[in-house]
Every structure is written in C-alpha cells, then in structure tokens.
C-alpha cells in the first residue's frame, strides 16, 4: 500500500467489489468520451443519484446541484461535517458565471487557470441553493471548478447544470482516491454509478479565494501558484 506519509496517491490493494445495483462504466480518459456512456451517467444524475467520476486531480463524488438526496448521501458517505461545503463543477466560464460573481480580477484569474486543477472561492449568486453556501466570515461564497478532464467536462455539459462535487476521501483518511478500483471498494455502497476512467494524479486542486481584487491561496495543490497573486 502507498500511504499518505510517502506523498504518493493513497491506494489500497485491488479487490473486486460486487455491490447489487451498482453500475460500472469504463470510459477511455484520453479520447472523446462515449456519448452513449456519458448519457447513461447523466440519466443517473437526473434521477437525483450519486456518481463517482475522475477529474484532473482526484476521483470525486457528484450529484446534480438541485439533488438534496444526493447531497445528503455524499455527506454521509464521507462522514463529512455539514459545515464543509461542496464545490460546483462547471463546463465553462459562461456556466460558472451563473453561480458565482466574477470581479475583473476573478475573471482574469479564471481565464488563466481554467480549465485546470484549481478551485476558485467566489461570492455566490442566488442560483446557488442555501444548503451549498459557505457563510464563513458572513460571506455567501461558493467553490467553482472547471477541470481539465474530458469525462468531468462531458458530464457537466450533458447534465446542463453544475455537478455538486466533493473529493473521494475515505472517512478517516486525508488523501483522496486516485484509482477507480479503490473508489469502488470504499464507496461502492454509497454511490449508484462509478466511472472507471483510469488513474488520476492523486493531488488536490489549488484553492484560491478572490474577494474584490484580493487573491488569497487557501490551499496549495496540483495547480501552480507562481504569479497568481500578481494577476
């Protein structure tokens, strides 16, 4: 096993996980995703269910933005504190602007880092459900991602609205899972569909908070931060 102390992606020995009702989709990550398979995953999301899928950083658990049931299942699966908010996966900046207010600085940063391994914490619009709002420091904020991964982007585009998302971190662990077999092993009983899209880098996104013209690095991750604060 490769552990967190080594700095490598957290994995577990391979083991087949046969879970009744769990759908597994194999999608090649280095080409245009199969429209038929993406449609199958989106059908599950439209039903308010939870999908595990790859991103440009780690594997994630996601549901449609309006699915309260899906949201609650993600929190239960990870045993997350309700104060830890989920992020939104958007297919592009145009879609993201419906859910977050972009100042000139935020727009310049977003143009620079998206699509890519970054999360931007921005003021939320009224399109974001209250359940998802981070009220830290009395601000209405939301995390926005536009990942550089064909499967994640295809899901968000086909769904027609953002994916509510959280990294696939097993309860009690600090690192997110990078391999689909591990995701199936740990979360197979908590999700309805797992997309096997190959391994991911296994490092979290870089999180940037932008308030007016001020940019702060909340978490250094896979995305480089050199020059970001000078944007």
Regions found by a protein language model. Give the residues of each.
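N-terminal amphipathic/basic-hydrophobic helices that include classical n-h-c signal peptides
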Residues: 1-19
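Active-site-adjacent structural elements in enzyme catalytic cores
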Residues: 13-231
């Amino acid at each position: 096993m490769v552990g967190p102390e080594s700095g490598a992606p957290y994995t577990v020995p391979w083991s087949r996980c046969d879970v009744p009702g769990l759908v597994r989709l194999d999608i090649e990550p280095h080409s245009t995703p199969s429209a038929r398979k993406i449609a199958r995953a989106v059908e599950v999301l439209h039903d308010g269910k939870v999908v595990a899928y790859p991103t440009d950083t780690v594997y994630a658990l996601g549901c449609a933005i309006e699915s309260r049931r899906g949201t609650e299942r993600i929190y239960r699966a990870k045993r997350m504190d309700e104060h830890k908010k989920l992020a939104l996966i958007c297919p592009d900046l145009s879609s993201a602007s419906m859910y977050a207010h972009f100042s000139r600085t935020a727009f310049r940063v977003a143009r620079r880092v998206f699509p890519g391994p970054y999360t931007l914490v921005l003021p939320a619009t009224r399109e974001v459900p209250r359940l998802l709002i981070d009220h830290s420091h009395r601000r209405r904020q939301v995390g926005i991602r536009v990942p550089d991964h064909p499967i994640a982007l295809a899901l968000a585009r086909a769904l027609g609205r953002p994916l509510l998302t959280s990294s696939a971190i097993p309860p009690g662990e600090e690192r997110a899972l990078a391999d689909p077999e591990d995701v199936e092993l740990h979360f197979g009983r908590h999700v309805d569909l797992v997309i096997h899209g190959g391994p991911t880098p296994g490092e979290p996104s870089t999180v940037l908070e932008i308030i007016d013209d001020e940019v702060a690095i909340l978490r250094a991750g896979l995305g480089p931060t050199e020059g970001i604060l000078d944007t």
